[in-house]
Amino acid sequence: PIAGSMVLAAILLKLGGYGIIRMMQIFPTTKTDLFLPFIVLALWGAILANLTCLQQTDLKSLIAYSSISHMGLVVAAIIIQTPWGLSGAMALMIAHGFTSSALFCLANMTYERTHTRILILTRGLHNTLPMATTWWLMTNLMNIAIPPSMNFTGELLIMSSLFNWCPTTIIILGLSMLITASYSLHMFLSTQMGPTLLNNQTEPTHSREHLLMTLHLVPLLMISMKPELVI
């Protein structure tokens, strides 16, 4: 169900990150090297989740793996125990909570009209649902973390803190961001561009759906303009 996916991606997954932040406070900050295996696993997990996104044909599964990949960066940033790392982790958790929940809403909006979640069968929706295409574009750009979004702020802080801790991590982070951009653009092009494959009449978008998307993206944009509210 869509409500369960939204709550799981936006709240419950982030509660795990919050729990790690609280637990890390009881460990000495000078023993970061002890957590090196966990940092490597977190970054490697982010890469694997991103690569898994590239081979997904199910729209909902793609968004779910996207949430997992972002949490890999969050865990790595928390474990190194630096102020920038914690600030970046908090920023990315909040921003991606809004973004992933909005993506699940859009996936459900598409499913209600096409009755399928297969990417290749949902193409061409920009011809019939142009306003929904606008929401898809904005949400995917947020997922890619374009400036000046909160996602960009969080990823920039995480990249800076991890690079300062170990310069080699910039290779993994750069690869992760490249794959994220690839599957986000693939998701947008697969669902919106191309000829429409549906022969039946498509129901137009409703005001409640636009309101739901507005309630996701407007708070995210407001926080992006004033990030000191959360970090």
UniProtKB/Swiss-Prot annotation:
<dbReference type="Pfam" id="PF00361">
    <property type="entry name" value="Proton_antipo_M"/>
</dbReference>
<dbReference type="GO" id="GO:0048039">
    <property type="term" value="F:ubiquinone binding"/>
</dbReference>
<dbReference type="InterPro" id="IPR003918">
    <property type="entry name" value="NADH_UbQ_OxRdtase"/>
</dbReference>
<keyword id="KW-1278">Translocase</keyword>
<keyword id="KW-0249">Electron transport</keyword>
<keyword id="KW-0520">NAD</keyword>
<dbReference type="GO" id="GO:0008137">
    <property type="term" value="F:NADH dehydrogenase (ubiquinone) activity"/>
</dbReference>
<keyword id="KW-0679">Respiratory chain</keyword>
<keyword id="KW-0812">Transmembrane</keyword>
<dbReference type="GO" id="GO:0015990">
    <property type="term" value="P:electron transport coupled proton transport"/>
</dbReference>
<comment type="similarity">
    <text>Belongs to the complex I subunit 4 family.</text>
</comment>
<dbReference type="GO" id="GO:0042773">
    <property type="term" value="P:ATP synthesis coupled electron transport"/>
</dbReference>
<dbReference type="GO" id="GO:0031966">
    <property type="term" value="C:mitochondrial membrane"/>
</dbReference>
<keyword id="KW-0472">Membrane</keyword>
<feature type="transmembrane region" description="Helical">
    <location>
        <begin position="63"/>
        <end position="85"/>
    </location>
</feature>
<keyword id="KW-0813">Transport</keyword>
<comment type="function">
    <text>Core subunit of the mitochondrial membrane respiratory chain NADH dehydrogenase (Complex I) that is believed to belong to the minimal assembly required for catalysis. Complex I functions in the transfer of electrons from NADH to the respiratory chain. The immediate electron acceptor for the enzyme is believed to be ubiquinone.</text>
</comment>
<feature type="transmembrane region" description="Helical">
    <location>
        <begin position="89"/>
        <end position="111"/>
    </location>
</feature>
<feature type="transmembrane region" description="Helical">
    <location>
        <begin position="124"/>
        <end position="146"/>
    </location>
</feature>
<feature type="transmembrane region" description="Helical">
    <location>
        <begin position="1"/>
        <end position="21"/>
    </location>
</feature>
<keyword id="KW-1133">Transmembrane helix</keyword>
<keyword id="KW-0830">Ubiquinone</keyword>
<protein>
    <recommendedName>
        <fullName>NADH-ubiquinone oxidoreductase chain 4</fullName>
        <ecNumber>7.1.1.2</ecNumber>
    </recommendedName>
</protein>
<keyword id="KW-0496">Mitochondrion</keyword>
<feature type="transmembrane region" description="Helical">
    <location>
        <begin position="34"/>
        <end position="54"/>
    </location>
</feature>
<feature type="transmembrane region" description="Helical">
    <location>
        <begin position="169"/>
        <end position="189"/>
    </location>
</feature>
<dbReference type="InterPro" id="IPR001750">
    <property type="entry name" value="ND/Mrp_TM"/>
</dbReference>
